[in-house]
Amino acid sequence: MSSSTSPYELKDLKNSSTEVHAAEQENEIEYFETDSNDRPSQQPHLDYEQHNTSAVRRFLDSFKRADQDQEQEAEVAQMNDLTSAISPSSRQAHELEKDETTDKIAPHTGHKSDSLKKTIQPRHVLMIALGTGIGTGLLVGNGTALVHAGPAGLLIGYAIMGSILYCIIQACGEMALVYSNLTGGYNAYPSFLVDDGFGFAVAWVYCLQWLCVCPLELVTASMTIKYWTTSVNPDVFVIIFYVLVITINIFGARGYAEAEFFFNCCKILMMTGFFILGIIIDVGGAGNDGYIGGKYWHEPGAFNGVHAIDRFKGVVATLVTAAFAFGGSEFIAITTAEQSNPRKAIPGAAKQMIYRILFLFLATIIIVGFLVPYNSDQLLGSSGGGTKASPYVIAIASHGVRVAPHFVNAVILLSVLSMANSSFYSSARLFLTLSEQGYAPKIFSYIDRAGRPLIAMCVSALFAVIAFCAASPKEDQVFTWLLAISGLSQLFTWTAICLSHIRFRRAMKVQGRSLGELGFKSQTGVWGSIYSCIMMILILIGQFWVAIAPIGEGKLDAQAFFENYLAMPILIVLYVGYKMWNKDWKLFIRADKIDLTSHRQIFDEELIKQEDDEYRERLRTGPYWRRVLAFWC
């Protein structure tokens, strides 16, 4: 070695020698019991990890606990995902965005998922965001809602929930921008803005929600298959879908972005095609029934129920299904808050939400109401003995159209499997989040070398076994239970977001802070959150009424109560249990004691005003089409 060798070169050579020595020792151990002639010749300059370790060994080693550096990287990735436990489809959009950003600043780790991170494009994020909500609640759960409420009641329920959702998107956008780096996302807001016990209870119920969604989607998938065949045991299909979901989450999916892009394109095209074909069938241009018009709004009627109280009860019951169908939409605001210009993107996301509510939800629900009577024995939740199917399939098949129903049913199957995969992913990450926040045992924070929360995934897989009830004659009841838990849990999450926003604005006022510090102010203001909070409390009260006096007989039924209201007792037990354990009985954090500095991004009020003035000037002096685009988009 020459005397001119630098200390850095000496250090590198020492490290290289150490690595080679370690590799030789490991080779000694590995081939200790093998014939000496089988032992490969030692080549000190070969990379042991790459050349001497088989793919199977690397795969098995990936389940070992990550070392300190890997664990830190994995935890960063998991914390980027913890707000993504919201909507299955939107959650994946956020994950992909975060992965793309992380890949630009993080060193190459050698993971096979790196190539996926580099392929994420805006078109993936856009289509995944548009496809949010087109799943079990809308495509299958609406069958039960139509039976209970009738076509007009179903439409009213979705319209009410849509108005609430718009205010929630505004509040969530404001909070997401100022707390964009907060561990736990919007699940963490109540812990420091409302009350720690309330935050604990809501976070656990939210985790329970996504635990329930996975078996719910698997059951729905088996029910969807019944449209084609009823001779095969449904559990056979559940096994296939169950193994598929777990396999994807163990190995990942190299082409996940393109797959989700494909799935969501299919959903959007299906909903658009259904709307057009539905209009053609309704006016007599296709099918065997000629002109239909609003026939089913007159016979059997627009509402289900003889008395006004029964009709009102049907609308109330519809609201939970609508909440589940809209579930995860609030995450669009979270994703938008992390784009390059969130102050302009969040209002656009709110407008996008209006269009989704109007065209993908309300418009197609109107068509379903025109083409499917609420007393059809094929609807889920009906008392008839017909084969249960999606109301979207029934709307086409019952009028003599042959090929299209199979395409619609196939897209529905893809939709529910996509959501099953996403919900499994989310529930495991939520367990990790709870552990990081101190709300769950530390064992759930185990992260392997591939960045998977392995213990949490095992719990999620065990919970998904509930789906094997698909062959039971009580399948419809289990579906109703899981749907009610998920729907009510979504209402709790939305209530927590709105209540946190109200308390945040109150603390800003009490502590004399200017709203100009906010990068984006909710267009509906604090009154929008108050409206949403009041409406959701009324919905919870109404759902309690429906639970103790079910639609139909109106008699108290314990089974019907737990089918419709199981999530509320769970929330109460978690809240009271936390208070008893910590001996902390305060109801809320006082506004003057709320911490408004930690984790919060404070914007320059003068700079924001200058940016807004410049933006308005560019619109004023720019072409007319740009002003039109800014108004509508």
UniProtKB/Swiss-Prot annotation:
Transmembrane keyword on record: yes
Acidic residues: compositionally biased ranges: 25-35
Keyword Coiled coil assigned: no
Transmembrane segments: 125-145, 149-169, 198-218, 232-252, 261-281, 314-334, 353-373, 393-413, 453-473, 478-498, 532-552, 558-578
Region (Disordered), start-end ranges: 1-52, 81-116
Ranges of the Extracellular topological domain: 146-148, 219-231, 282-313, 374-392, 474-477, 553-557
Main location: membrane
A molecular-function term among this protein's GO annotations: amino acid transmembrane transporter activity
Topological relation to the membrane, as annotated: Multi-pass membrane protein
Positions on the Cytoplasmic side per record topology: 1-124, 170-197, 253-260, 335-352, 414-452, 499-531, 579-633
Listed Basic and acidic residues bias regions: 92-116
Lipidation (S-palmitoyl cysteine): 633
Highest classification ranks of the organism: Eukaryota, Fungi, Dikarya, Ascomycota, Saccharomycotina
Function: Broad substrate range permease which transports asparagine and glutamine with intermediate specificity. Also transports Ala, Cys, Gly, Ser, Thr, Cys, Met, Phe, Tyr, Ile, Leu and Val. Important for the utilization of amino acids as a nitrogen source.
Assigned keywords, A-Z: Amino-acid transport, Cell membrane, Lipoprotein, Membrane, Palmitate, Transmembrane, Transmembrane helix, Transport
Subcellular compartments: Cell membrane
One GO term describing the cellular component: plasma membrane
Superkingdom, taxonomy of origin: Eukaryota
The protein, known as: General amino acid permease AGP1
Family per similarity comment: Belongs to the amino acid-polyamine-organocation (APC) superfamily. YAT (TC 2.A.3.10) family.
Composition bias, Polar residues: 81-91
